[in-house]
Each structure stands twice: as C-alpha cells, then as structure tokens.
Amino acid sequence: MEYLKAGGRGFFVPYENSDGKTYIHLATRLTEADFLHDDFHSLGDAVLAEFKDGKIIFSNDSRLPSQEELSKPLSGITDGEFELSGRVVLLKSYPGLDYSELRIKHDNVCAVVNVTYHTGSAPCAGGSFGLPEFCDECHKNGVDVYLAGLRKTDDIYETSKQIYEHGAEPIYSVSVPAAVSKLRAAYNSSLKNIDTLISNDIYYESLPQEEK
C-alpha cells in the first residue's frame, strides 16, 4: 500500500529478503527465488523501489519504465478466446546433459524453452545427444525450441551459432519465468504471428542494455 500511496504504478511485487530489505519489483522482471535464502530479485537488479524506514525510495535506474509509462493502459494480446491448453516445457542445460534421453512429442506441447548457461551456450558435443540434434528432433514433431537466459551480443561462441543454425530461437534479456509466460500466452492466443508477440515487449519484461 505504501508504494501506491507514494504514487507508484504498475504490476508490482513487494518482497522482504533475508537481509531485511524490502524491494518493490516489476512483476514481469522478477527472477526465480534464490533457493539458499528464498530471496527474490529483479532482472539485472533493477528494482522499482525500496521500502526503507517507512518510506518508498524510487529507483532512478534508466532501464526501468517511468511511473507515467507504467500507468498507461496496455492493449490485450488477443481478441479471441484465451485458454492455456497448449503446454510449454522448460529445460535447463548443464554440462554433460544427454538430450537423446529426452522425448518431446506434440501432445499439447507447443514449445520448449531451454535455459542456457554461460553466455548462451549449451551442450553441442555432436552425435545424437547435443542441443542442435534435440532441436531437429523437436521440429520433426512440430515443437518449436526457444533459448532463454541470454542477452543479445555480437560476441557469441561457435556452439551458440550452431544451435541457432538448427532453428532454436533466442529470447533475449528476459527472466526465465517471463520467457515461459510469453510463450504460453503466444501459443494459446489467436495470434497468427507468434514471433511478433515473442520479440515485442508485452509489459516491459525485456531489460534494455545498461547505459554507459
């Protein structure tokens, strides 16, 4: 309530972390909880505000939308019916992951989100157990593959290029929960151009590059 009384706007999440500090997060940039302390953070540590000594201290981070922008009504993503019948599967890469053991069929599965590790890389050892081969298998079954957990940069590994060449579509600079939510919304809407919804911001979920 203090955030609203202070003039705060938008779809927000307040949470007190284990250090006793209470932050106000933009909901679409909330990351997964830290399992060691059960703390929540904002993507890029760009919080909307902090509640300190009974007062709301708004952030001046340039990567955040202004309160004026947050107060503007947004158009809906679809004019038709919206049912979450299409499923989105979430996978997380780790060194040595054998993708050949995974079988994703089209039974209500529309897409796979694969969370990459360091600088957007994933297992690409060749043979039949790398992510590129997994992408090929998914596409044969009518399932699209997306990558999350990466930012847009010209400096990428050759393995990352190989993954892109096998049809994996990157979702840049959004949290993993936001990436999954966008895909669920896209594949369960009446939109014909799903890529447009995925590449565009719905509600400020994409984190802009930090100004230098």
Please provide the spans of the model-predicted regions.
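Short beta-strand segments
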Residues: 12-16, 92, 115, 148-149
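Functionally constrained cores in energy, signaling, and assembly domains
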Residues: 7, 86, 105, 114, ...
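Hydrophobic helix-cap positions at the C-terminus of alpha-helices
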Residues: 3, 105, 137-138
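Accessory alpha-helical/coil subdomains and C-terminal extensions
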Residues: 21-125, 211-212
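Short, glycine/serine-rich, charged loops/turns that create anion-binding
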Residues: 18, 95, 152
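C-terminal non-catalytic interaction/assembly regions of soluble proteins
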Residues: 119-212
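A charged, well-structured terminal subsegment
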Residues: 1-39, 46, 174-211
